[in-house]
Amino acid sequence: MVHSQLPVAGPLRLLCALLLLPSATMIPGGLSPRSVTDPDVQEAAEFAVQEYNALSANAYYYKQLRIVEAQSQVVSGAKYYLTMELMKTKCAKTTGKPKVYKEIQNCELPPKAQQEKLTCHFQVWSRPWLGKIELTKMSCN
């Protein structure tokens, strides 16, 4: 009986070794947690806020309060998965040139009783060698 279990020992050792690897080990093509302060994460977040304001039908701009969570994935470039909090500002969207991110971030917030906060999930795909960055998914509530 002991003799029949020997072929299982090799794969069992491999499985045990894999289970002992740190959970943060990077898997090619897999999602990796990222620091919300990383410059490329900040750039993706700025782009997401800019696009949210361009695409939304809201009469006022929303600014970034904070990045709650960031992950990235290597997929012919980098795809960023961001969870962010946005807050409605007192800056109205007017006809003409839209505000850029830094201008939006300088907009004042309404009084506490009138504040509207959103939690948004964004996917941003960056391909810097092509000079392209796209918002591929957006949902806010």
Swiss-Prot record:
<feature type="disulfide bond">
    <location>
        <begin position="120"/>
        <end position="140"/>
    </location>
</feature>
<comment type="similarity">
    <text>Belongs to the cystatin family.</text>
</comment>
<dbReference type="InterPro" id="IPR046350">
    <property type="entry name" value="Cystatin_sf"/>
</dbReference>
<feature type="disulfide bond">
    <location>
        <begin position="91"/>
        <end position="107"/>
    </location>
</feature>
<dbReference type="InterPro" id="IPR000010">
    <property type="entry name" value="Cystatin_dom"/>
</dbReference>
<dbReference type="GO" id="GO:0070062">
    <property type="term" value="C:extracellular exosome"/>
</dbReference>
<keyword id="KW-0789">Thiol protease inhibitor</keyword>
<comment type="function">
    <text>Inhibits various C1 cysteine proteases including cathepsin L, papain and cathepsin B. This protein has no toxic activity and its function in the venom is unknown. It may play a role as a housekeeping or regulatory protein.</text>
</comment>
<protein>
    <recommendedName>
        <fullName>Cystatin</fullName>
    </recommendedName>
</protein>
<keyword id="KW-0732">Signal</keyword>
<dbReference type="GO" id="GO:0004869">
    <property type="term" value="F:cysteine-type endopeptidase inhibitor activity"/>
</dbReference>
<feature type="domain" description="Cystatin">
    <location>
        <begin position="29"/>
        <end position="129"/>
    </location>
</feature>
<keyword id="KW-1015">Disulfide bond</keyword>
<keyword id="KW-0964">Secreted</keyword>
<dbReference type="Pfam" id="PF00031">
    <property type="entry name" value="Cystatin"/>
</dbReference>
<feature type="site" description="Reactive site">
    <location>
        <position position="29"/>
    </location>
</feature>
<dbReference type="InterPro" id="IPR018073">
    <property type="entry name" value="Prot_inh_cystat_CS"/>
</dbReference>
<feature type="short sequence motif" description="Secondary area of contact">
    <location>
        <begin position="73"/>
        <end position="77"/>
    </location>
</feature>
<feature type="signal peptide">
    <location>
        <begin position="1"/>
        <end position="26"/>
    </location>
</feature>
<keyword id="KW-0646">Protease inhibitor</keyword>
